[in-house]
Curated annotation (Swiss-Prot):
The modification Leucine amide is found at residue 11. Keywords: Amidation, Amphibian defense peptide, Secreted. Shows neither neuropeptide activity nor antibiotic activity. Its main location: secreted. Expressed by the skin dorsal glands. GO terms for biological process: defense response. One of its GO terms (cellular component) is extracellular region. It comes from Litoria rubella. This is Rubellidin-4.1. It is found in: Secreted.
Length: 11
């Protein structure tokens, strides 16, 4: 999802 990668980056 949208927060999949962003979540890993901590964004």
């Amino acid at each position: 999802g949208l927060g999949d990668i962003l979540g890993l980056l901590g964004l």
